[in-house]
Amino acid sequence: MSELVGIARFKIHEGKLEEFKRLSAEAMEIVRTRDTGTLQYDTYFNDDQSECVIVERYKDSESAIGHAEHLGDISAAVLAIVSVVHGELLGEPSEELRANLAGIEVPQLFTPYQLM
């Protein structure tokens, strides 16, 4: 069982900021009420709110899979109004999570080299 960290950076399409904020609030409510293994789910904006970074931390791969399942419809709606600048998953994912990520470009997986 290994903690995982996800980092995603999005560029919000012109005129879609309020829709993004609405969807983000819906996602936060789902995370707070349904995700039992999500340890962190934070959204940060740049100064003009044209881009955001989302930092997610999960207690294990099963929690990350559950999070993705809970946010499925909202994630699809968000991806329709943003461009993905980059995304990383940091940690040692299970074989099931690796299989779920196979064949997609984002997030890019980084496994530990040195940890404190």
Question: Which role does the model predict for each range below?
Answer:
Residues 1-52, 59-70, 80-116:
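Short S/T/G/P-rich N-terminal loop/turn motif that feeds into the first structured element of a domain
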Residues 72-76:
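A short, acidic, amphipathic alpha-helical segment used as a generic capping/interface helix at domain edges
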